[in-house]
Swiss-Prot record:
It comes from Agrobacterium fabrum (strain C58 / ATCC 33970) (Agrobacterium tumefaciens (strain C58)). GO terms for molecular function: GTP binding; GTPase activity; translation elongation factor activity. The gene is fusA. Residues 8-288 form the tr-type G domain. Coiled coil: none annotated. NCBIfam families: EF-G, PRK12740.1-5, small_GTP. Pfam families: EF-G_D2, EFG_C, EFG_III, EFG_IV, GTP_EFTU. The keyword Nucleotide-binding applies. GTP binds at residues 17-24, 86-90, 140-143. It is found in: Cytoplasm. One of its GO terms (cellular component) is cytoplasm. Catalyzes the GTP-dependent ribosomal translocation step during translation elongation. During this step, the ribosome changes from the pre-translocational (PRE) to the post-translocational (POST) state as the newly formed A-site-bound peptidyl-tRNA and P-site-bound deacylated tRNA move to the P and E sites, respectively. Catalyzes the coordinated movement of the two tRNA molecules, the mRNA and conformational changes in the ribosome. Gene3D superfamilies: 3.30.230.10, 3.30.70.240, Elongation Factor G (Translational Gtpase), domain 3 (3.30.70.870), P-loop containing nucleotide triphosphate hydrolases (3.40.50.300), Translation factors (2.40.30.10). It comes from the Bacteria. This is Elongation factor G.
Length: 699
């Protein structure tokens, strides 16, 4: 089967925005006008095509990005193939946005005309900057009370530090919003309400808006000629670029991420969507317009490039794993080069494992169609892959390459979880592993000390939804607890202890004497053991028993039973008995010796200190620092990054629970933070007493 659409006619793009800016509704309208949906799904009815998980339809938010292929005839009458990814706007799901942006060529950033640039808009914008994704802007909800297009344009400059090139002006606002002025063609488009937005009339620009339209067209031309010397020279000499030239310059500037063309409308009221689709064709890149993807040669580790060309060796990136109720596990992959046929064997170069592509599917939200072959630029769902996880490269076994991996954020919140019944224990393990395979920002581990299963994720809503999915999809009922901090213990001063173990009770007795110096290990947190025995006071074969005895006590410290760190033990003397001594006797002696010594060597409680980085607009710096100080945090420094301030601090993990909620309310949701483990630090004595009182009862 030959390629149906040329690669230059592909547009792989995503729709990104703050929660509630109308992303899913806009995608629904795109699917409706491109003929993929026969009935428009409304989010507030819980019927949107792209929101296909039960929780999404209940909560009215998009959690997983669904990929959809659809088609659109451009202004030139030629059909184009769109691969669209709908992404979530909630901060707990940034991983979904991150992985979508990694495999897309362009994006539409959606703004709510009433709110303008919102906190999550800033977050996803920063993510798109990281991957250098060309973006257009659609100012949605122009029919809403308080809608202000011009304020939104200003906020793009002040909050995002970006340049918006205004391509359309609104005609009316709020309930009076009727249509838009096209600043290239210099005419007005007025939608007919009775046609569900499918028809509009092209009319003259209203008299009261002519001066404004002239002013904004002038601004548009001024901005775009700057990227082309010849056009700039002509412009300075009074020669204006024609409409085709303007479009060509807007396309170039958008693809080079010099500026962002901006449009307006209301997806819900069906106005402005078709010109937006024409703009996707005119201004967003095809796979040929963006730089070739870089990778590393699997064998030589040299850098290589893969171009968007069917004749190149196959390379693709798995960017999402999803459980489908009918097909089982589906791996979404973007094909960067070469072509893929059903039944082909490919190699996963990250895991160094062969995989066979059983079925290949073209996805439309949650319905699907089987395909035999896919080409460079396609986004496909593959069934039957066993080893592949998010971020892995799949490629031609004869020309292996490892494409740049995705970076996944570390989880910032963890809670203990246990099944409600014994029968659910095994099912819970399977469910958690399946969910972790789908979502790299979700981790599962067993706490060795408490035996509890700990789940970690990007926020409370994130974990909430995963526990909910476990109940719905895997029928596992679970109880969720509060997380506990993994404290440690150590000693702070040198102490010498002499201990004799004697047991005489008929038959062979037990005898061992050890003299050991215990002190903090100057080389770090590990345990260090040395023997300085001379003259055979303790025979060589018994010395491993001395070390083993001390090590067995390290797992439970004298204060609250937490593992001990940073201890050094030096065996300096001892005594033995020809008949009654044994390795076991010396193990028992050294164990008791350390237990005695630990109490006298200045035992101290340690707590995990987290490296916390808060990215916040300047207005909230004082509040953020004050709050971190109140959490026993130590501020390490601050620096400006673009139009935000980055604050670094070390904060005890025990004081970071619920921080995400506090930070959101403190900064109206505009600040973000990341947290990683840094080091263990002594617990202040007043806090240590509370912890000891709490845990010594559990020992």
């Amino acid at each position: 089967m030959a390629r149906e659409y040329k690669i230059e006619d592909y547009r792989n793009f995503g729709i990104m925005a703050h929660i509630d800016a109308g992303k899913t509704t806009t995608t629904e309208r795109i699917l409706y006008y491109t003929g993929k949906s026969h009935k428009i799904g409304e989010v507030h009815d819980g019927a949107a095509t792209m929101d296909w998980m039960e929780q999404e339809q209940e909560r009215g938010i998009t959690i997983t990005s669904a990929a959809t292929t659809t088609f659109w005839k451009g202004r030139d009458g030629k059909m184009r193939r769109f691969n669209i990814i709908d992404t979530p706007g909630h901060v707990d799901f940034t991983i979904e946005v991150e992985r979508s942006l990694r495999v897309l060529d362009g994006a539409i950033a959606l703004l709510d005309a009433n709110a303008g640039v919102e906190p999550q808009t800033e977050t996803v914008w920063r993510q798109a900057e990281k991957y250098n994704v060309p973006r257009m802007i659609f100012c949605n909800k122009m029919d809403k009370t308080g809608a202000d297009f011009y304020r939104s344009v200003e906020m793009i400059k002040t909050r995002l530090g970006a340049t918006a090139v205004v391509m359309q002006l609104p005609i009316g606002a709020e309930t009076e919003f009727k249509g838009v002025i096209d600043l290239i063609e210099m005419n007005a488009l007025i939608w007919r309400d009775e046609s569900l937005g499918a028809q509009w009339d092209v009319v003259e620009i209203p008299d009261d808006l002519k001066a404004k339209a002239d002013e904004y067209r002038e601004k548009l031309i001024e901005t775009v000629v700057e990227i082309d010397e010849e056009a700039m020279e002509d412009y300075l000499n009074g020669i204006m670029p024609d409409n085709d030239k303007i479009r060509a310059l807007v396309r170039r500037g958008t693809i080079d991420v010099k500026f962002h063309p901006m449009f307006c409308g209301t997806a819900f009221k069906n106005k402005g969507v078709q010109p937006l689709l024409d703009a996707v064709v005119d201004y967003l890149p095809s796979p040929l317009d963006i730089p070739a993807i870089k990778g590393i040669d699997f064998k030589t580790e040299a850098e290589i490039e893969r171009h968007a060309d069917d004749s190149e060796p196959l390379s693709m990136l798995a960017f999402k794993i999803m459980n489908d109720p009918f097909v089982g596990s589906l791996t979404f992959a973007r094909i960067y080069s070469g072509k893929l046929e059903k039944g082909t064997s490919v190699i996963n170069t990250v895991k160094d494992k062969r995989e066979r592509v059983g079925r290949m599917l073209q996805m439309h939200s949650n319905s699907r169609e089987d395909i035999e072959e896919a080409f460079a630029g396609d986004i496909v769902a593959l069934a039957g892959l066993k080893e592949t996880t998010t971020g892995d490269t799949l490629c031609d076994p004869l020309k292996p390459v490892i494409l740049e991996r995705m970076e996944f954020p570390e989880p910032v919140i963890q809670i203990a979880i246990e099944p409600k019944t014994k029968g659910d224990q095994e099912k819970m393990g399977l469910a958690l592993n399946r969910l972790a395979a789908e979502d790299p920002s979700f981790r599962v581990k067993t706490d060795e000390e408490s035996g509890q299963t700990i789940i970690a994720g990007m926020g409370e809503l994130h974990l909430d939804i995963l526990v909910d999915r476990m109940r719905r999809e895997f029928k596992v009922e679970a109880t969720v607890g509060a997380p506990q901090v993994a404290y440690r213990e150590t000693i702070t001063r040198q102490h010498e202890e002499d201990y004799t173990h004697k047991k005489q009770s008929g038959g062979t007795g037990q005898f061992a004497r050890v003299k050991i110096i215990f002190e903090p290990n100057p080389e770090g947190e590990d345990f260090k053991f040395e023997s300085k025995i001379v003259g055979g006071a303790v025979p060589k074969e018994y010395i491993p028993g001395v070390q083993k005895g001390i090590e067995s006590v390290l797992s439970s410290g004298p204060l609250a039973g937490f593992p001990m760190l940073g201890v050094k033990a030096t065996l300096i003397d001892g005594a033995y008995h020809d008949v009654d001594s044994s390795v076991l006797a010396f193990e028992i002696a050294s164990r008791a010796c350390f237990r005695e010594a630990a109490k006298k060597a200045g035992a101290q409680l340690l707590e995990p200190m987290m490296k916390v980085e808060v990215v916040t607009p300047e207005d909230y710096v004082g509040d953020v620092i004050g709050d971190l100080n109140s959490r026993r945090g130590q501020i390490q420094g601050q620096e400006s990054r673009g139009i935000t301030i980055v604050i670094s601090a070390h904060v005890p993990l025990a004081n970071m629970f619920k921080y995400v909620d506090n930070l959101r309310s403190m900064s109206q949701g505009r600040a973000q933070y990341s947290m990683t483990f840094d080091h263990y630090s002594p617990v202040p004595s007043n806090v240590a007493q509370e912890i000891q009182a709490k845990y010594s009862g559990q020992k």
